């Protein structure tokens, strides 16, 4: 017989049989070897066929293995030949193929030959249930009336089972999430599916709006019988594109697989609906020189109505791939899936609530659901509902689940702190000086205190964890019973439904109530370690961590901090009372929730001479709001003096170099949406730059070069300018209102009215006087004292020395900047020299005084 007339799978089985014979030192390849090799093939087709014929495939595999071990062995034989028994069986197989009209000999025909075999292989197979009649029936069912016309024919069988996932089956066993709402879209899809031709809906919408969920909803309705008569008992299959492409090594192999899928669907005569998620991937899939792609292979079947297909893709990809192929586009009917409203999202989340509670073993409260929908809509602007709201619920529940399963955050922090202290203790033990011994004593005390605290917390945690897990187990059992009730209702077994619904279910609900009550009674709110509920506060925490925006309810400490905001800012900014008050009011309005949600927290134009605290106030504000100056986005507008430099702020347009990189301003705000944006020296920028700032100041949004909307609603925008600084110095003796009026006139000549009209406040910084400079000197000296404290040195400076520094560093034209230079020259330089000379050592006091026209530094030892 010719080996090239065997199917590819049969040839592979023969090669595996040869390897088996070599591995067992058998001189001949016997039917036992080939039968075992077929059973061990990775796709499991032979096993499935034998199982259909009522054969115990697992038992047969073990028996064949044992029989091979009993075959005669020859040591050193490098060549194996086809044995006489196998040769005669292969001839019998060929006859079976001719009888059936096959062009290639398939592996299942060898099983028919084995069924009639009088040798060892036939005996073992019959012992495990192999019968010719049952096997023939199984082969006919698998072949579906087809003959074997190509070498790849076997691999194309049962293509639907291999390359699709049955969505209706998943709905039947309760694997799919419930689909709430979307009735109009599902009804429209059903309407299109009932057409005579072009009965193929394509769901188009933004990522995350629920396109796939609509198809899942359709599958659930089919299972529940809530569809028109023509759709009842149909199957919804999801095409596995990755499975179709994976391992298609040779040209034409992918096309053969897809053709097999289409043929199988055609055989089902309209009882199958094929769902292709990300349908744009079909355009160009499998394309090679001289070959047609998957999209073109689908067109004839779609046009004839043989293929009921539902597609899903995003708006961008539909435009980019499907619309370009007009012939493919006309075969689909568009169903637009819009983003649901906040109210609709809340309804969707309530439907999913039970599934997520069950998965995470926690309780999700209704305030958490409302907060997830509202906060995601307001603060996560680059994604779409309901996906982003579901993500918040999922992550908040996962966080609480993680606390239950692993150590709570409080214990984890204690544990890490203990490890840190123990490492430090070992390091300090090696030192012998007095300071190190004192430090060792403190470390020992701290370790003892923390270990006691940790032991107390561990005891509470274990008790709470046991109670939480008890309730979760009962919830899982309730879910299983509900799924069983739904299945029995579909099958019409109402007696069993009644038994479960009125017997088992109330019993479990009673258990759950008891478990929840036990959990609640074990709660000691002040000491409670484990949270078992997801509330609005937990959702707010997730949003805050993701965006850096403080959306949680204000604690009393933060309320007090905001009420005393002016005092905190005045610790760094001296003399500019009006500026500090205006900025503080803007922040309080936004944090209290009464500011316009569609505008930035505040937009200010700071005007004044150099060195009076404009930039310092921005730094102080960033430090106050975020405890870090890193949230200050500072852009020097003198870099944007040319017209074309606007693109550097928002990113280059398509086709230009740097398109992928994004803009300075837009990228910085996308990464830190809650920040202070400082546009320094704004009057030096090109007038066209102000045009892009108009929509930021008015609507709190800006579109970057890639078409993405960047949200500025949680930023404070500050622009500084030196316009009118000469007027401020010349009119120093005039009242603030007169100065502001004069400066305002000059500002109006430089900036456009539509720009000035959108700014919340124009703040005029007045020139600093001698008293202000003295206060600033004390702030600067405190910073120097803090730096010296790191070296265990104490700085003590007398009032005459401060006064002299203030007078030396006072210049009405340059503001406070000369003061820094005065401190550097008069204090820092001499002290640095003395430290290097060894005149000051740790524990010393560095006294600074001024008399007889110069500064003195007389060492004092403590």
UniProtKB/Swiss-Prot annotation:
Region Repeat 2, residue ranges: 82-145
UniProt xrefs under Pfam families: AAA (PF00004), AAA_2 (PF07724), AAA_lid_9 (PF17871), Clp_N (PF02861), ClpB_D2-small (PF10431)
Compartment(s): Cytoplasm
Disulphide bridges, residue numbers: none
Superkingdom of this protein's organism: Bacteria
Annotated GO MF terms: ATP binding; ATP hydrolysis activity
Sequence segments annotated as region (NBD1): 158-339
Protein residues bound to ATP 1: 205-212
Principal subcellular localization: cytoplasm
Occurrences of domain Clp R (ranges): 3-145
Keywords: ATP-binding, Chaperone, Coiled coil, Cytoplasm, Nucleotide-binding, Repeat, Stress response
Region of interest called NBD2, as start-end residue ranges on this chain: 558-767
Region listing for Repeat 1, in residue ranges: 6-71
Gene Ontology biological-process annotations: cellular response to heat; protein refolding
Similarity-based family: Belongs to the ClpA/ClpB family.
Described function: Part of a stress-induced multi-chaperone system, it is involved in the recovery of the cell from heat-induced damage, in cooperation with DnaK, DnaJ and GrpE. Acts before DnaK, in the processing of protein aggregates. Protein binding stimulates the ATPase activity; ATP hydrolysis unfolds the denatured protein aggregates, which probably helps expose new hydrophobic binding sites on the surface of ClpB-bound aggregates, contributing to the solubilization and refolding of denatured protein aggregates by DnaK.
Domain remarks: The Clp repeat (R) domain probably functions as a substrate-discriminating domain, recruiting aggregated proteins to the ClpB hexamer and/or stabilizing bound proteins. The NBD2 domain is responsible for oligomerization, whereas the NBD1 domain stabilizes the hexamer probably in an ATP-dependent manner. The movement of the coiled-coil domain is essential for ClpB ability to rescue proteins from an aggregated state, probably by pulling apart large aggregated proteins, which are bound between the coiled-coils motifs of adjacent ClpB subunits in the functional hexamer.
Full protein name: Chaperone protein ClpB
């Amino acid at each position: 017989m010719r080996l090239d007339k065997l199917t590819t799978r049969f040839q592979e089985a023969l090669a595996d049989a040869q390897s088996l014979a070599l591995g067992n030192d058998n001189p001949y390849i016997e039917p036992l070897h080939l039968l075992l090799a077929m059973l061990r093939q990775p796709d499991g087709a032979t096993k499935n066929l034998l199982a259909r014929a009522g054969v115990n495939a697992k038992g047969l595999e073990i028996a064949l293995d044992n029989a091979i071990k009993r075959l005669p062995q020859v040591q050193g034989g490098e060549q194996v030949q086809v044995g006489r028994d196998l040769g005669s069986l292969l001839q019998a197989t060929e006859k079976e193929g001719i009888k059936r009209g096959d062009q290639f000999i398939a592996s299942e025909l060898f099983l028919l030959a084995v069924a009639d075999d009088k040798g060892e292989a036939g005996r073992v197979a019959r012992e495990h249930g192999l019968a010719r009649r049952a096997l023939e029936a199984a082969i006919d069912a698998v072949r579906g009336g087809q003959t074997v016309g190509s070498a790849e024919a076997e691999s194309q069988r049962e293509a639907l089972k291999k390359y699709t996932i049955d969505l209706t089956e998943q709905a039947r066993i309760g694997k799919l999430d419930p689909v709430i709402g979307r009735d109009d879209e599902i009804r429209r899809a059903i309407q299109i599916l009932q057409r005579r031709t072009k009965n193929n809906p394509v769901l188009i919408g933004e990522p995350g709006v629920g396109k796939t969920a609509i198809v899942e909803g359709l599958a659930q309705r089919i299972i529940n019988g809530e569809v028109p008569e023509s759709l009842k008992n149909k199957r919804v299959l999801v095409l596995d594109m990755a499975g179709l492409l994976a391992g298609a090594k040779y040209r034409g192999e992918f096309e053969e697989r897809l053709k097999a899928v289409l043929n199988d669907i055609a055989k089902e005569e309209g009882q199958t609906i094929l769902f292709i998620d990300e349908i744009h991937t079909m355009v160009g899939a499998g394309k090679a020189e001289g070959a047609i792609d998957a999209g073109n292979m689908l067109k004839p079947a779609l046009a004839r109505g043989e293929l009921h297909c539902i597609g899903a893709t995003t708006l961008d990809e539909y435009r980019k791939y499907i619309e370009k192929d007009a012939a493919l586009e006309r075969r689909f009917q568009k169903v637009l899936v819009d983003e649901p409203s906040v109210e609709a999202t809340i309804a969707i989340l309530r439907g999913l609530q039970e599934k997520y509670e069950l998965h995470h073993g926690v309780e999700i409260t209704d305030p958490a659901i409302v907060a997830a929908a509202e906060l995601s809509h307001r603060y996560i602007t680059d994604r779409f509902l309901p996906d982003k709201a579901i993500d918040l619920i999922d992550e908040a529940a996962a966080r609480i689940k993680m606390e239950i399963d692993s150590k709570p955050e409080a214990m984890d922090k204690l544990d890490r702190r203990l490890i840190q202290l123990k490492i430090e203790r070992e390091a300090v033990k090696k030192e012998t000086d007095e300071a190190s011994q004192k430090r060792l004593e403190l470390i020992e005390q701290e370790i003892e205190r923390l270990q006691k605290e940790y032991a107390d917390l561990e005891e509470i945690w274990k008790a709470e964890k046991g109670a939480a897990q008890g309730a979760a187990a009962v919830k899982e059992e309730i879910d299983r019973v509900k799924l069983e009730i739904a299945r029995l209702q579909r099958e019409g077994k109402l007696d069993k439904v009644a038994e479960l619904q009125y017997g088992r279910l109330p019993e479990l609900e009673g258990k759950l109530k008891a478990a929840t009550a036990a959990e609640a009674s074990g709660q000691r709110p002040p000491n409670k370690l484990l949270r078992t509920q997801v509330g609005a506060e937990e959702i707010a925490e997730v949003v805050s961590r993701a965006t850096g925006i403080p959306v949680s309810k204000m604690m009393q400490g933060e309320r007090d901090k905001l009420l005393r905001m002016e005092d905190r800012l005045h610790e760094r900014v001296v003399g500019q009372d009006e500026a500090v008050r205006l900025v503080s009011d803007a922040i309080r309005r936004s944090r209290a929730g009464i500011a316009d949600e569609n505008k930035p927290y505040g937009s200010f134009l700071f005007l004044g001479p150099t060195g009076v605290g404009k930039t310092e106030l921005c730094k102080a504000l960033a430090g106050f709001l975020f405890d870090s100056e890193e949230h200050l986005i500072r852009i020097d507008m003198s870099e944007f003096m040319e017209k074309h430099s606007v693109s550097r702020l928002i990113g280059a347009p398509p086709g230009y170099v740097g398109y992928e990189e994004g803009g300075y301003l837009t990228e910085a705000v996308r990464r830190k949406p809650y920040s202070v944006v400082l546009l320094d020296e704004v009057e030096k920028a090109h007038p066209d730059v102000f045009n892009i700032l108009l929509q930021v100041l008015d609507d709190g949004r800006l579109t970057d070069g890639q078409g993405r909307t960047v949200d500025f609603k949680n930023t404070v925008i500050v622009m500084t300018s030196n316009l009118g600084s000469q007027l401020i110095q010349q009119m120093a003796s005039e009242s603030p209102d007169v100065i502001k009026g004069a400066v305002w006139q000059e500002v109006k000549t430089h900036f456009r009215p539509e720009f000035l009209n959108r700014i919340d406040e124009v703040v005029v910084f007045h020139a600093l006087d001698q008293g202000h400079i003295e206060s600033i000197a004390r702030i600067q000296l405190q910073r120097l004292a803090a730096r010296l404290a790191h070296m265990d040195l104490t700085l003590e400076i007398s009032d005459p020395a401060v006064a002299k520094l203030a007078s030396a560093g006072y210049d009405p034209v340059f503001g406070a900047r000369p003061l820094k230079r005065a401190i550097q020259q008069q204090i820092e330089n001499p002290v640095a020299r003395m430290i290097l000379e060894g005149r000051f050592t740790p524990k010393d006091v560095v006294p600074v005084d001024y008399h007889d026209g110069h500064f003195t530094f007389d060492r004092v030892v403590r």
